[in-house]
């Protein structure tokens, strides 16, 4: 058991469990958290154990879930509450180690190396203590995987649920994991599993037994990585809680309550998405130089385009103008050619203080992107002052206090930044 001691703590049925904190009576009935069918996102995003036993699965539509479990209770998601519970969970973990790395809202890695000796507890006792504290102080359960690397710790928390501790060490990992289907190997996607099956690899043990070169020939770099993980060769560190992961892009998307049939409706949706993106970039001290947009039709046909700007930006109006130009250039929105959903992204990020050699006006920028009808433009310096002032007002009064070119449209399901959808 020499070396590192890594925990992976995973909230069980997290969204559903959070809802049951305020409504403990829901624990005794089949319950699922699901989107609003009116917004065309009526799918199950989490379910409790009773719904799970009835066969309800995450991503089931509401109709499918009700077919499997006629008496199921559906509740809408409350993401602010889930974030609050997540912070409380991590606060408990941070009492035992500075190395707490949230992997998502409901799971975190902990580097507990040295903790057993310090606290006078075995690894299992420490994991059980964390489970007990989360259960008693917050009101939800977690499963904890304990291992010498992050990959096996994660597989440990998946191994036995709910409210369980699983230890996977060098002495027992082959016995525990190698008989499992290769599809249960962390990061083994469906296509990779199918490729490995064609080469006679159906268990994790068979994956580990093949040569590293074989896996690279089969699957490229991802195959080599899977081979390393299957053999317990994962030395990726656990970050400190304060160390933020590198942000590579910021994007927002939305499926609208009904199809968008004109450019004014598209502009309304784009404005709200871009407002959130620009606020996130500014709060993170980042700018981006590549703007992308993805449109999806009711037929689920998808169209994506992007453009590289002559300089990085986090200005809402600039991002919106370029996004609208991309849409105008590539999609004639109408009742015959409607839009079901839009996703806007900004990537190739850099620090906000990074200098660039040329400041073009928005008019020049539009000219470089295309020649279709342009939105009203404002000089970059003036627009920067406007958006900086808006950011300060939002900080004081709330995100929904001021909007920039955005408005609510209940018919298509759009709410301004900061207002609950």
List the predicted regions and their residue ranges.
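Residue-level signal for secondary-structure boundary sites
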Residues: 41, 118, 152, 301, ...
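Short, charged/polar surface micro-motifs in flexible loops or helix N-caps
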Residues: 12-14, 37-40, 298-301, 349-352
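Gly/Gly-Pro- and Ser/Thr-rich, intrinsically disordered tail segments characteristic of DNA damage-repair
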Residues: 1-228, 238-241, 279, 369-421
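DNA-contacting surface of Y-family translesion DNA polymerases
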Residues: 184, 192-338, 356
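C-terminal hydrophobic structural anchor segments
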Residues: 313-314, 318-325, 329-392
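Short, histidine-centered active-site or binding-site loop motifs used for metal coordination
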Residues: 112-114, 254, 308, 366
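A glycine-rich phosphate-binding loop feature that marks nucleotide/adenosyl-phosphate handling sites
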Residues: 148-151, 232, 287-298, 339-350, ...
